[in-house]
């Protein structure tokens, strides 16, 4: 199957997403889980240890500075669903303003990040990676803050892992997901405009919304 940016956007709007069996497999298939993972934007959990890590402020955050580097970081593992076709099409979505990344830097090195697709008030988190301890958690904390600031009402994680569950992620039924998706697509979401907060402001906002 040949992907296109328009086909991808149509698929996301209908609740399905693409995957490949491996990096070297050229084929792409559609996934529509019976149980869908979401990260409630008012229920993101920041543990004491993560709050302490955020306050250390020995990192910097950027948005859309190195989208390709984040996708490559996510694909740089023994088993990955990101093949060449998927990589290229998400670069196209990024160029068109529908796919975004959030990066974590330490000592001028990209050490973590997350990327996904934005449609209306829905953000479809595709993947994340970490090369330093807690870097992906830091990325998610800033992502959730950004989604809240930008007016998003749905953060789709596709599946739930123990890592996501520890941060507040949960599963809902396909029918419940479709209802939330339809509502989110009717809402405006702005990924670009919100300013990056300081760690102190991020933690204060989280306390106010939890």
From Swiss-Prot:
Gene3D superfamilies: Leucyl/phenylalanyl-tRNA-protein transferase, C-terminal domain. It is found in: Cytoplasm. It is an enzyme of class 2 (transferase). InterPro entries: Acyl_CoA_acyltransferase, Leu/Phe-tRNA_Trfase, Leu/Phe-tRNA_Trfase_C. Keywords: Acyltransferase, Cytoplasm, Transferase. One of its GO terms (cellular component) is cytoplasm. It comes from the Bacteria. The keyword Acyltransferase applies. Its EC number is 2.3.2.6. GO terms for biological process: protein catabolic process. The keyword Acyltransferase applies. GO terms for molecular function: leucyl-tRNA--protein transferase activity. It catalyses: N-terminal L-lysyl-[protein] + L-leucyl-tRNA(Leu) = N-terminal L-leucyl-L-lysyl-[protein] + tRNA(Leu) + H(+); N-terminal L-arginyl-[protein] + L-leucyl-tRNA(Leu) = N-terminal L-leucyl-L-arginyl-[protein] + tRNA(Leu) + H(+); L-phenylalanyl-tRNA(Phe) + an N-terminal L-alpha-aminoacyl-[protein] = an N-terminal L-phenylalanyl-L-alpha-aminoacyl-[protein] + tRNA(Phe). Belongs to the L/F-transferase family. Functions in the N-end rule pathway of protein degradation where it conjugates Leu, Phe and, less efficiently, Met from aminoacyl-tRNAs to the N-termini of proteins containing an N-terminal arginine or lysine. PANTHER family: LEUCYL/PHENYLALANYL-TRNA--PROTEIN TRANSFERASE, LEUCYL_PHENYLALANYL-TRNA--PROTEIN TRANSFERASE. This is Leucyl/phenylalanyl-tRNA--protein transferase. It comes from Ruegeria sp. (strain TM1040) (Silicibacter sp.).
